[in-house]
From Swiss-Prot:
Keyword Amino-acid biosynthesis: no
Annotated residues for binding of GTP: 107-114, 189-193, 247-250
Entry GO MF terms: 7S RNA binding; ATP hydrolysis activity; GTP binding; GTPase activity
Matching CDD domains: SRP54_G
Protein name from the UniProt record: Signal recognition particle 54 kDa protein
GO BP terms, alphabetized: SRP-dependent cotranslational protein targeting to membrane
Gene name per UniProt: srp54
Domain remarks: Composed of three domains: the N-terminal N domain, which is responsible for interactions with the ribosome, the central G domain, which binds GTP, and the C-terminal M domain, which binds the RNA and the signal sequence of the RNC.
Cellular component terms (Gene Ontology): signal recognition particle
């Protein structure tokens, strides 16, 4: 989970209010101290923390809750509102207004820029845009091959020449190449060789003058914490069309420091990197981000994930008719497991459900994820005939499947038991209920 330790600490602070018999000044000050401690441990600038928590304390002690809202609920709302304001208030998505829209990506060495270029290309492809990627990184020979490796499976073309040493020439030729192909979006990757902002900004200006991008995006490594302030500020002052993506928020305790430092400059954060996979990039919406961070859920984010699934996995009405008649196969179950896998880590999904927040222990979640992985491996060891007609799977087949998948007979039996329960469940529903369920879960 992105900023897991910070989220747990903030969520625990709010629980003190929720569980208290009554709320007095001493409790408010105690909770404010907990919030201060959590933010400082996440490498948020101390001056910013004190300013934020002073306002939370003032409002919590002075404001009267509106009619119908308890004092506890009002204080939780105040914490939510002030943290949201702290991180930028509103979402500012990248807009594809012109065809083609050109995005220029820059970032210092090790920021995760090239991987982020691939993630961004995939993000827009999933939303129906035709995307082309230009690799103008002439400094690192592996950059072109890295982009090809990441994007070839999704049939996203990468333009580049590992032997060319002129970055500006490559960028210009790449943009012209994709303009001729009529793509909707061109993403230009640049060299990440600079360790200092001023060198980076100089190269950005030179390439910008040649390709005239609609937006320049700085990729910042979330593990650098509050040091991100200097990078973001220099960048914001250098270009009026700049925005920021903060990466590696899944792997650092300093991510909160990086996010708050960037937000303090006023530079808009457009996306955050939430993992290593190509789909682990999400639009940054401060309100939804804070809601998840505090354990309050993110229903809108969950619904968007389901909507994405509708394009990936689609069961026809004929399929649903089959399910109602009890003709639900292991192949259908496999498609569902694959759909769940595409939604992202189970922990990430559960954090979006209001009320669950951080209440489920990590070990429980990891057992659930391991079980799903195991089921998929077991089904990969089955024949097409077994997947389509599970009734033929007798004990000798179970032993063969267990051997082939490196699992136990007990594991295979557990999968078959789960399958039979799902089959029974579908058979017990009427068509209207099943259609509603199908729409909800991307079937």
């Amino acid at each position: 989970m992105v900023l897991d330790s910070l989220g747990k600490a903030l969520s625990n602070a709010l629980k003190k209010i929720a569980r208290a018999g009554s709320v007095d000044e001493a409790l408010v000050k105690e909770v404010v101290r907990d919030i201060q401690r959590a933010l400082i441990q996440a490498d948020v600038n101390v001056r910013l923390v004190l300013k934020l928590t002073k306002e939370i304390q003032r409002r919590a002690l002075e404001e009267k809750p509106p009619a119908g809202i308890s004092k506890k609920e009002h204080i939780i709302k105040i914490v939510y509102e002030e943290l949201t304001k702290f991180l930028g208030t509103e979402a500012k998505p990248i807009e594809i207004k012109e065809k083609p829209t050109i995005l220029l990506m820059v970032g210092v060495q090790g920021s995760g820029k090239t991987t982020t270029v691939a993630k961004l290309a995939r993000h827009f492809q999933k939303r129906g845009y035709k995307v082309g990627v230009v690799c103008s990184d002439t400094w690192r020979p592996g950059a072109y091959h890295q982009l090809k490796q990441l994007l070839d499976p999704y049939h996203i073309e990468v333009f580049g020449d590992p032997n060319e040493k002129d970055a500006i020439k490559l960028a210009k030729e790449g943009v012209e190449h994709f303009k001729a192909k009529g793509v909707d979006l061109i993403i230009v990757d640049t060299a990440g060789r600079h360790k200092e902002e001023k060198d980076l900004i100089e190269e950005m200006r030179m390439i910008s003058n040649e390709i005239k991008p609609h937006e320049v995006i700085l990729v910042i490594d979330g593990t650098i914490g509050q040091q991100a302030y200097n990078q973001a500020l220099a960048f914001k002052e250098a270009t009026p069309i700049g925005s920021i993506i903060v990466t590696k928020l899944d792997s650092s305790a300093k991510g909160g420091g990086a996010l708050s430092a960037v937000a303090a400059t006023g530079a808009p954060i457009k996306f955050i990197g939430t993992g290593e996979k190509i789909d682990d990039l999400e639009p940054f919406d401060p309100a939804r981000f804070v809601s998840r961070l505090l354990g309050l859920g993110d229903i809108q984010g969950l619904l968007e994930k389901f909507k994405e699934l509708e394009k990936e996995v689609e069961f026809t009405e004929e399929d649903l008719e089959r399910f109602l008649k009890g003709k639900f196969t292991l192949k259908d179950m496999y498609a569902q497991l694959e759909a769940m896998r595409k939604m992202g880590p189970l922990k990430q999904i559960l954090r979006m459900i209001p009320g669950l927040g951080y209440s489920l222990p990590d070990e429980v979640i990891s057992v659930g994820e391991e079980r799903l992985r195991k089921f998929k491996v077991i089904m990969d060891s089955m024949t097409e005939e077994e997947l389509m007609n599970p009734d033929i799977i007798n004990y000798s087949r179970i032993k063969r499947i267990a051997r082939g998948s490196g699992t136990s007979v007990k594991d295979v039996k557990e999968l078959l038991n789960q399958y039979n329960q799902m089959k029974k469940f579908f058979k017990s529903m009427n068509k209207r209920q099943l259609l509603r369920l199908a729409r909800r879960f991307g079937m």
